[in-house]
Design a protein with these regions (language model features):
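Short, Lys/Arg-rich, polar N-terminal cytosolic tail immediately upstream
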Residues: 1-11
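Core segments of alpha-helical transmembrane spans in multipass integral membrane proteins
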Residues: 24, 28-32, 51-73, 88-92
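Non-cytosolic membrane-interface motifs at loop->transmembrane helix junctions
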Residues: 45-52, 106-117
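Hydrophobic alpha-helical membrane segments
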Residues: 83-97
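Membrane-helix boundary connector in multi-pass membrane proteins
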Residues: 95-112, 130
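Membrane-water interface at the C-terminal end of transmembrane alpha helices
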Residues: 119-140
């Protein structure tokens, strides 16, 4: 099977670089939210301690998701199950965020960028990884 990967080695490397760079988004946002609280995402002074605690917890999850994506990078072609699960988690969060758009209106541009990452970019990376898996290994 290693011989089959050779024609796609460059494309695998490009995917690895893309995932490594794009995983900086949840890692950075998660770290900022955990350290500085939800105020880092906008005015939050009147939200109270419970909202801050929830925001820090969710930021920790976001940070961990980014680290988990990083863990797929070295052998991304063999990380199908993990990559699909992480994509499902991110996409589900995006659906929840999109629900908020319909219920309370558009969020800030930063949050809309997050929405694009969750509903478009991350699934595209997953489909790309699956395509490479099929091409390299003939399996899903």
């Amino acid at each position: 099977m290693a011989r089959q990967k050779i024609p796609y080695a460059l494309e695998i490397k490009v995917l690895q670089v893309a995932v490594a760079i794009l995983a900086l988004v949840p890692i950075g946002a998660g770290l900022a939210g955990a350290v500085f609280g939800i105020g880092v995402f906008g005015p939050a002074a009147s939200l109270g301690h419970d909202a801050d605690s929830t925001g820090r917890y969710l930021s920790g999850l976001l940070f961990a998701i980014g680290l988990a994506f990083w863990s797929t990078v070295p052998s991304i072609e063999a990380q199908g199950v993990r990559f699909r699960l992480l994509t499902l988690l991110v996409f589900t969060g995006g659906i929840a965020r999109l629900t908020g758009v319909f219920l309370v209106g558009l969020a800030s541009p930063v949050m809309l960028f997050g929405l694009a990452m969750e509903l478009f970019i991350t699934p595209c990376l997953a489909f790309w990884r699956e395509r490479l898996d099929r091409l390299c290994n003939g399996a899903l």
